[in-house]
Regions:
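Hydrophobic alpha-helical connector segments
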Residues: 59, 73-103, 113, 121-125
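Short, Lys/Arg-enriched anionic-surface-contact patches
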Residues: 5-10
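Amphipathic, non-membrane alpha-helical segments in soluble helical-bundle scaffolds
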Residues: 54-58, 83, 87, 117-118, ...
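Amphipathic alpha-helical packing segments from all-alpha helical-bundle domains
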Residues: 111-146
Length: 146
């Protein structure tokens, strides 16, 4: 049985390989065989960790949406107006999607998978509540989600 360290290392290598392959070839054109080869893992290791290529996309989506507001905050400054922060975050997403056709495809894939849409909406709703609560007191994250 693989140790926790080995599993985490395999997971990191799979994610790294996927990011590189998805950006180079696109999500749809990247095969599981290519991921296995680039990551240097066996099929059983891959399927034990991720089960499908789609589950990797979900994890990458979660990472991206978990960090996008932090990155935007670093760009404009942590103490900036929250509405400006939201505008910068939105512009950052649009710019990234326009920079590279394969990156745009990743965004489209992420936004069309029901599991990912749910994740995106919930994470965005929490951030929108933080940003707009001064203007809409009494609103909760679910008010921005539902």
């Amino acid at each position: 049985m693989a140790s926790r360290y080995e599993k985490e290392d395999s997971k990191r290598r799979i994610l790294s390989a996927c990011v590189q392959l998805f950006l180079e070839k696109g999500y749809q054109k990247t095969t599981t065989v290519e991921i296995l080869k680039k990551a240097g893992v066996t099929p059983s290791t891959f399927y034990n960790i991720y089960h499908t290529k789609g589950s990797i996309l979900t994890e990458l989506t979660e990472f991206m949406f978990g960090n996008q507001f932090n990155i935007s905050g670093k760009i404009v400054g942590e103490e900036t107006n929250p509405v400006l922060l939201y505008a910068v975050e939105t512009c950052l997403q649009l710019t990234l999607a326009e920079l590279n056709e394969n990156l745009r495809e990743i965004y489209v894939e992420a936004y069309t998978v029901p599991e990912n849409i749910e994740l995106i909406h919930k994470k965005t709703a929490v951030q929108l509540q933080k940003i707009f609560v001064p203007y809409l007191p009494g609103y909760s994250a679910s008010d921005f989600y539902e």
